[in-house]
Amino acid sequence: GAKVHSTIRSNDLSLNHPAILDFQNRLSNYEPPAKNMVLLILPCSARKPYFKSSSHKRFFNALREVDNHLALHVVSVTSPLGLVPRELEFCYPAAHYDIAVTGKWSASEIEMLRNQLIKLNPTKHYVKAIVHAGSSSKIMTELVKELGIEVVDTRVDRPSSYEGLEILQNIARMTLSDVPLLNTKDRAKGEAKGLANFQY
């Protein structure tokens, strides 16, 4: 039968929880849906999976008005998991943890984020990056820069506010203007492959 997963709560969870470490290690097997995409780093949300949250719905609605928005690859930043690509939001334990999001990062968490970013191999998969992660933006922008990727920090404190969405839309439009067009079929095929590589 289907595997039943209990919610992991902050009092019994640390960076060394076996389910967390397993998810992080398997990120090395994962590949984004296509080559030459733009990495878009967003904040996580209290609601899981993130794409069902009101803030992520607002991000999606703003971005789908942008030409070639399918070439954006959404990755959410969170503790203790680190980085969660959109296609993996249903995977355990990404949809099964309950931890307050503070935006304050300890030295060990920053090191964990650095390692997760390296596992995503951005220099191989992405042509540019946009960081729109609120209180986590500064640290994520620095980590992406360390790897030599061209990155734009939207510098927005409230990412899902009307003003924040407008800024994100404009930056996405400019960033995507010279990025190869990605169609729905190829994107869907790439998403399925990335998920399979991660799970198996």
What are these model-derived regions, one by one?
Residues 19-23, 30, 34-120, 177-200:
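Conserved mixed alpha/beta catalytic, RNA-binding, or beta-rich assembly cores of soluble enzyme
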Residues 110-190, 194:
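Glycine/proline-rich loop-helix segments at beta-alpha junctions forming the active-site rim
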Residues 1-16:
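Helix-enriched interaction subdomains in cytosolic or periplasmic regions
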